């Protein structure tokens, strides 16, 4: 292929094979390898493709560290392969990208920002007490983070029925759970099927294993704007009815017509406007710093993100107390 700017030509491996006016580049020789396109390192873990632009980096498995265990927990839901559901959607938020990184593993806001969604579930017959979940939040190292909680009042296609799903799916959902018990034992089966999980991979990937599995990546386009892409995901062995229930559950919360995404967009943009005030010097993430056990509604997982962000910027840990999150 040929660069439309100056006409340099490359083969499919990125090697430079054509150079107009070669004589002017005699100091560099004729089509030297160093003038070819830079090879980007990439690796795959459990069908997730990761790329890394830095010149030096650890192996993918080393970088993921403890986060691998939770990717496994998500992918082990089925013996079939995880697959992307055709479609997906893109949107932007007028807020700094780090606010979305925080939001992805923030369980504290659920009963407030998403109150209307919980009320909607109640109208379907969901027990209001089931919204009072128990769980934990974890900083997994390298900036990765997790919140995990249950019982999943919204239900889970694998494998926890709720009034959000058709009554006819009860037997197949129960059978999926029994198969998980056969494969992994009762304890791990319950971890897989009876808990909601939001896994953040530093710096810009969130895997939401909730009422409908979705994968979110995001990239800053300005200091006060972020571009977001969300894909739904499922498993290759699902029946048409199971896939329909998964998609319906997903879009009830995620996307422009869902209860959740518009709430989060409005809240984050409101936060961004507030952080523009010069007198606001920091954002408080001290919730849960005292207790030895980290609840999912505490903020250790958010502090883990900020520690890694600070480390990469070469800041001392004490400086975290002085950070303005809108920077």
Give the ranges of each region predicted by the language model.
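C-terminal catalytic domain of Rieske-type non-heme iron oxygenases
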Residues: 40-327
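Rieske [2Fe-2S] iron-sulfur-binding domain
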Residues: 1-69
């Amino acid at each position: 292929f040929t660069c439309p700017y100056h006409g340099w030509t490359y083969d499919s491996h990125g090697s430079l094979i054509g150079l107009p006016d070669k004589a002017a580049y005699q100091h560099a020789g004729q089509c030297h390898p160093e003038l070819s396109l830079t090879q980007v390192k990439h690796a795959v873990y459990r069908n997730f493709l990761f790329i890394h632009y830095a010149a030096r980096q650890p192996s993918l498995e080393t970088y993921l560290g403890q986060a691998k265990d939770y990717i496994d927990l998500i992918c082990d839901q089925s013996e079939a392969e995880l697959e992307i559901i055709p479609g997906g959607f893109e949107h932007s938020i007028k807020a700094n990208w780090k606010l979305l990184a925080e939001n992805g593993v923030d369980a504290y806001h659920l009963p407030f920002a998403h109150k209307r969604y919980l009320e909607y579930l109640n109208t379907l017959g969901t027990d209001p007490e089931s919204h009072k979940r128990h769980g934990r939040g974890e900083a997994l190292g390298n900036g990765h983070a997790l919140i995990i909680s249950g019982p999943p009042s919204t239900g889970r296609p694998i494998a926890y029925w709720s009034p959000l799903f058709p009554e006819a799916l009860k037997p197949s959902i129960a059978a999926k759970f029994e198969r998980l018990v056969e494969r992994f034992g009762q304890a791990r089966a319950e971890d897989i099927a009876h808990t909601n999980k939001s896994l953040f991979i530093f710096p810009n990937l969130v895997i939401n294993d909730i009422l409908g599995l979705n994968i979110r990546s995001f990239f800053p386009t300005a200091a006060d704007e972020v571009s977001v892409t969300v894909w739904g995901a499922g498993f290759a062995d699902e029946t048409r009815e199971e896939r329909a229930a998964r998609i319906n559950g997903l879009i009830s919360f995620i996307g422009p017509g869902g209860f959740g995404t518009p709430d989060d967009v409005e809240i984050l943009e409101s936060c961004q406007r507030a952080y523009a005030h010069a007198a606001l010097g920091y954002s408080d993430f001290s919730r849960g710093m005292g207790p030895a056990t980290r609840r999912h509604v505490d903020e250790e997982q958010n502090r883990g993100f900020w520690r890694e962000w600070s480390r990469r910027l070469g800041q001392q840990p004490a400086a975290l107390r002085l950070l303005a999150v809108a920077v």
